[in-house]
Amino acid sequence: MEPGLWILLGLTVTAAAGFVPCPQTGGAGRTSVPRAPRVAGSEGDCEDSVASPRRQTVAPTAGKGPSPGSPGRGQAAEGDPGHRRVRRCTCFTYKDKECVYYCHLDIIWINTPE
């Protein structure tokens, strides 16, 4: 491959590695919902999906399948966003190696069976 293509590929991967999109609610009608202006230091913050790195968040039915009386996937198709996994790390970018390292150590520690 030519060096220019390698550089383009490397820049694309590097740029994509630090991007963590915040979930958007409301679908096509989002324009009618007023949003607060972004604060300069708040890049990477998702208020409704950020969890403390020390707090373990597990759904009450995480290990169970759908119960016989529950609608299952049909409920998610009707407009319910379904189960969304919360963000455990509050690192602003993946380029913050120290934050990512300690956050993932904490996740591994929490998920390790005794």
Curated annotation (Swiss-Prot):
Endothelins are endothelium-derived vasoconstrictor peptides. The record marks W109, I110 as: Cleavage. Residues 1-17 form the signal peptide. Disulfide bonds join C89-C103, C91-C99. Residues 18-86, 110-114 form a propeptide. The keyword Oxidoreductase does not apply. Residues 24-83 are annotated as: Disordered. One of its GO terms (molecular function) is hormone activity. This is Endothelin-3. The keyword Disulfide bond applies. It is found in: Secreted. Belongs to the endothelin/sarafotoxin family. Keywords: Cleavage on pair of basic residues, Disulfide bond, Secreted, Signal, Vasoactive, Vasoconstrictor. Pfam families: Endothelin. One of its GO terms (cellular component) is extracellular space. The gene is EDN3. GO terms for biological process: intracellular calcium ion homeostasis; regulation of systemic arterial blood pressure by endothelin; regulation of vasoconstriction; vein smooth muscle contraction.
